[in-house]
Design a protein with these regions (language model features):
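Conserved glycine-rich cofactor-binding loop
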Residues: 10-11
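Conserved glycine-rich Rossmann-like NAD(P)H-binding loop of the short-chain dehydrogenase/reductase
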Residues: 24-41
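Rossmann-fold cofactor-recognition segment
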Residues: 45-60
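Short alpha-helical oligomerization interface
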Residues: 89-102
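Residue(s) in the substrate-gating loop at a strand-loop-helix junction
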Residues: 132
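C-terminal helical subdomain
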Residues: 174, 187-223
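Active-site helix of classical SDR
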Residues: 112, 148
Length: 238
């Protein structure tokens, strides 16, 4: 039986990913802060699954919780690190920004590092990290969020190089979504994609063991433009 852990499974991309992976026969370890949401989701899915609460604000505790879940499941071939927080920063607020750094940087790093170490010990596996197209440009009204996602994408790129040097069958997939219709999105700007469509493309990238994927595919054009256009022009849009 294929087994996967989804960190950040209580809503949005993680929730839909659980639905689609379970339909493919995966036994899942569902992790998020809201235990009630995870339990409800596990009852909706075919088969038996594991539920474990986790809060990436406390990275040390989160590491223990991930390790415990892996032991409970016995063997895990796929770990998806999807947890992340974002907020509009009309006013610079340290409480908001420090939470984003704790979750999106420290928490993400802890989960990804431990997943990689586990896969090295196991002799192979697949780590999927959810970043954002926001990693490719700075946003004046969400500067910390953009900066944390730049870290995530860079970290995963480095992890991919490390996996290659290990000569083990370890795949690192970077997922960079654009606008996806999830609870995190405050409005619905142009090119907002239904979460079902977005996750279908993510699942395809997982199956094909892609190293990097934009979600949806049209966002590759935006990413390229942000590298080509001058900064003064980009600042008119972000």
């Amino acid at each position: 039986m294929k087994r996967a852990i989804i960190i950040g499974a209580s809503s949005g991309i993680g929730y839909e990913l659980a639905i689609q992976l379970a339909a493919l026969g995966y036994q899942l370890g569902l992790m998020a802060r809201r235990e009630a949401c995870l339990t409800e989701l596990s009852h909706l899915l075919p088969g038996d699954h594991f539920v474990q609460t986790i809060d990436l604000i406390d990275a040390d505790a989160a590491r223990t919780q991930l390790a415990d879940l892996i032991v409970q499941m016995g063997d895990v071939e796929l770990i998806v690190v999807n947890s992340g927080v974002g907020a509009s920063e009309k006013q610079l607020d340290w409480n908001i920004e420090s939470e984003m750094i704790d979750v999106n940087v420290r928490g993400f790093t802890a989960m990804s590092m431990d997943a990689m170490n586990y896969f090295v010990q196991r002799g192979g596996g697949h780590l999927v990290g959810v970043s954002s197209v926001a990693a490719h440009f700075s946003g004046g009204l969400a500067l910390t969020y953009h900066a944390t996602k730049a870290f995530v994408s860079s970290y995963l790129n480095g992890m991919r190089s490390r996996a290659a040097r290990s000569r083990l069958p370890i795949t690192i997939t970077t997922v960079e979504p654009g606008f996806i219709d999830t609870p995190m999105l405050e409005t619905k700007p142009m090119w907002t994609a239904p979460v079902e469509k977005a996750v279908t493309q993510i699942v395809k990238a997982i199956i094909n063991k892609k190293g990097h994927v934009y979600i949806t595919k049209r966002w590759v054009v935006v990413a390229i433009l942000f590298y080509i256009l001058p900064n003064w022009l980009i600042r008119k849009f972000v």
